[in-house]
Design a protein with these regions (language model features):
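Aromatic-rich carbohydrate-recognition surfaces in CAZymes
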Residues: 14, 89-204
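Low-complexity, Ser/Thr/Pro/Gly-enriched N-terminal "stalk/linker" regions
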Residues: 1-91, 114
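Accessible peptide chain termini
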Residues: 1, 204-205
Length: 205
């Protein structure tokens, strides 16, 4: 499979909302990553008498999560520290969004939500965002018109759930332009004539 990069294709109809995307071209974060050992006492603790195996499983999930934190590779276009999908050296839109559904509960220690920043920073000028991006060089696994290239659009749901828990209005203002541009791209390129959306089996995850 070939490698593709943001805005490397020949023909684009630029989306005006992308010009308001502050993640594109941002300097990468340069902060150390926390370890599970440093974080464990600041993570939520379940209280469930007699279910020690379940609590041990819960603790192990956090240990695995902190073991998969990564920093942006120089030149990759990644802008934020993030949690790795731990599959094939790529970060995935769907996997990341669902990981962040539990990651938000560890936000006092690490801002897991910033993982999605690395998708916004790779937005094309027409609003497209790839669902699978190489972590080492920022290349994308699909051209933007491949039926499996992106979507369905789960990132706004993930961001809204984060807002309901954290109440970060500044983040809502920051993510709105790239999400609106991405929504518009999906509306223009992944809908049938009756207005319903389409994707492929592979594109669903």
């Amino acid at each position: 499979m070939g490698k593709f990069f943001s805005d490397s294709e020949w023909t684009y109809a630029p989306c005006t909302y992308v010009s308001e995307n502050t993640f594109v071209g941002r300097e990468p974060e340069d902060a150390p990553l926390p370890t599970y050992e440093d974080a464990r006492d600041r993570l939520p603790k379940p209280v469930w008498e007699g279910h020690y195996d379940a609590i041990a499983c819960y603790d192990k999930a956090w240990q695995i999560a902190f073991g998969n934190l990564r920093r942006p590779t120089p030149g990759s276009g990644f802008v934020s520290n993030f949690i790795d999908t731990a599959f094939n050296g790529c970060t995935f839109m769907w996997d990341s969004s669902f990981i962040l559904m539990f990651g938000k509960y560890g936000s006092r220690v690490f801002n897991f939500q910033n993982t999605l920043n690395n998708f916004y920073s790779h937005q094309h000028v027409d609003g497209f965002i790839s669902r699978e991006i190489e972590e080492d060089d920022g290349s994308e696994k699909f051209t933007r018109f491949d039926p499996s290239a992106t979507g369905p659009n789960v990132m706004p749901w993930c961001e809204w759930e984060y807002y309901l828990n954290i109440g970060d209005r500044l983040r809502i203002a920051e993510i709105f332009p790239p999400l609106l541009a991405y929504h518009k791209w999906l509306h223009d390129n992944h809908t049938w004539q009756d207005g319903t959306y389409w994707t492929s089996g592979l594109g669903c995850g």
